[in-house]
Amino acid sequence: MGKERTAAITRVVVPLAHGFEEIETVTVVDILRRAGISVTVAGVETGSPPGAIEGRTGIRLVPDLSIAGVQASDFDMIVLPGGLKGAQTLQKDTRVARLLRSLQDNDRYIAAICAAPTVLASHGMIAGRRLTSHPSVKDQLAGAIYDEQRVVVDGRLVTSRGPGTAMEFALVLVEILEGKQKVEEVKQEVLARL
């Protein structure tokens, strides 16, 4: 797992909608940025520039830009945060659907945590794929090979279960994108014992 380090900066996009799960979102964005990965948080709500987007517990985040300004060719990975309401909004957003399809068609990584694998299911992207999710949405993932591991990697699809697995999920993403040494550096910096 992981790629050889190159001079190119790895780029990740994180779409954000009202009702996102804060722990999952902030943990992933923070850990990836600590690893030197360029992370763009793209708001799917209306408005330009996008205003603050409220998470499921009321914490507000301001996206870097609107999803309308995102080009799939600019990114190596997309990470879909959970939070049921946020995931439901991502399911309905045609721009997110186009972005997912383009990334998949170009053999890029797709990652989803908690309720977010339902976004992939709603776009017919999980049939025969091994994945996991928050237990509350398991029944919405028909056609997938469901696995209860905390983080599941199936080719270029990475899924995880929920807020309590966010750090492990983020570190697996770092390993995939930047290698094991970078994971160890980040773990040492944040005092992670995973």
Where are these regions (language model features)?
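Short, thiol/selenol-centered motifs that function as redox-active sites or metal-ligating centers
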Residues: 113-114
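Extended, subdomain-level signal for the structured scaffold at the beginning of enzyme domains
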Residues: 1-108, 119-128, 140-148, 156-194
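Long, charge-patterned amphipathic alpha-helical coiled-coil/hairpin "stalk" segments used as oligomerization
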Residues: 135-137
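Cytochrome P450 catalytic-domain "roof"
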Residues: 153
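Anionic-ligand binding patches
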Residues: 131
